[in-house]
């Protein structure tokens, strides 16, 4: 197995760090780092649901993704200044929301919403997969917070862990967790969202300028699942530590939002 420019093996993740309690106001707040890619992920509970959801008795989980102006080498204007949200931003926001809704029982929230915000502080490839992986940890902390305050119908609404990783074919080799230098010249580029129960949530794959074989797809998926398993271990280790904020000593069960 060959070494990459950054010294990693083909199947090796960049150094991954998960810091809980990164900010103090949200119920869940995480800084996740995949090498030089750094994303702040927060989870906040808000009362009410979208109009189309009212009367269902079900909660909702939504997500927003954004890149800070100086998160890349060349500064870009905020989308709020441009007056519209770009297609890429909308796509990634929806991906994060879909990924996390796959693991939560929304009926436990009542008609209330968990809002996930993912802000890229520094980008070096794999920002959407880092966002999903970090957002799951923020969501888990938000669930702990809400359960401790007696605001959930079910104190354990999460059915599985969620993590995501980029994989691709670079220089003819299947590699995981691509930095920008590899992502920008990959022959095949793919993002995979997986659960710790062995199932997949989403697979996004593209041949960049050429087609690729079914056997290559299988190799990419195998590599992604193997890398995701490593991320699940890191998530579990991070969440094994005490909740980083203040929880009540003796919560009283009551309806969320009351």
From Swiss-Prot:
Gene Ontology MF terms in the entry: 3'-5'-RNA exonuclease activity; tRNA binding; tRNA nucleotidyltransferase activity
Query: Can you state which reaction this protein catalyses?
Result: tRNA(n+1) + phosphate = tRNA(n) + a ribonucleoside 5'-diphosphate
Q: Is Oxidoreductase found in the keyword set?
A: no
Presence of the UniProt keyword Transferase in the record? yes
- Known Gene3D superfamilies for this protein? GHMP Kinase, N-terminal domain
Record keywords: Nucleotidyltransferase, RNA-binding, rRNA processing, Transferase, tRNA processing, tRNA-binding
Report the transmembrane regions from the record. none
Q: Name one GO biological process term.
A: rRNA catabolic process
Identify the enzyme class. transferase
The record's annotation in InterPro entries points to: ExoRNase_PH_dom1, ExoRNase_PH_dom2, ExoRNase_PH_dom2_sf, PNPase/RNase_PH_dom_sf, Ribosomal_Su5_D2-typ_SF, RNase_PH, RNase_PH_bac-type, RNase_PH_CS
Listed binding positions for phosphate are: 88, 126-128
Q: EC no.? A: 2.7.7.56
Functionally, this protein is described as follows: Phosphorolytic 3'-5' exoribonuclease that plays an important role in tRNA 3'-end maturation. Removes nucleotide residues following the 3'-CCA terminus of tRNAs; can also add nucleotides to the ends of RNA molecules by using nucleoside diphosphates as substrates, but this may not be physiologically important. Probably plays a role in initiation of 16S rRNA degradation (leading to ribosome degradation) during starvation.
Q: Which family does the record assign? A: Belongs to the RNase PH family.
Subunit structure, as described in the record: Homohexameric ring arranged as a trimer of dimers.
Protein name, UniProt field? Ribonuclease PH
């Amino acid at each position: 197995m060959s070494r990459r420019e950054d010294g990693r093996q083909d199947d090796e993740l960049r150094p991954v760090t998960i810091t809980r309690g990164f900010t103090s106001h949200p119920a869940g707040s995480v800084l996740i780092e995949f090498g030089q890619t750094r994303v702040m992920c927060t989870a906040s509970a808000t009362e009410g649901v979208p109009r189309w959801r009212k009367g269902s008795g079900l909660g909702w989980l939504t997500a927003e993704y954004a890149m800070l102006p100086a998160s890349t080498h060349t500064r870009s204007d905020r989308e709020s200044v441009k007056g519209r949200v770009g297609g890429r931003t909308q796509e990634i926001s929806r991906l994060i929301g879909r990924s996390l809704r796959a693991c939560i029982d929304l009926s436990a929230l009542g008609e209330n919403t968990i809002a996930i915000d993912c802000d890229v502080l520094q980008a070096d490839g794999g920002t959407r997969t880092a966002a999903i992986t970090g957002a799951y940890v923020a969501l888990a902390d938000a669930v702990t917070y809400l359960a401790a305050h007696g605001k959930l119908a079910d104190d354990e609404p999460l059915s599985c862990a969620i993590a995501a990783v980029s994989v691709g074919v670079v220089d003819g080799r299947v590699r995981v967790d691509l930095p920008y230098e590899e992502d920008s010249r990959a022959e095949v580029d793919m993002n995979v969202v997986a659960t710790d129960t062995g199932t997949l949530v989403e697979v996004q794959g593209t041949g960049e300028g050429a087609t690729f074989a079914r056997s290559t797809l299988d190799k990419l998926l195998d590599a992604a699942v193997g890398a995701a398993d490593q991320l699940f271990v890191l998530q579990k280790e991070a969440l094994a530590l005490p909740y980083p904020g203040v929880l009540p000593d003796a919560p009283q069960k009551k309806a969320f939002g009351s």
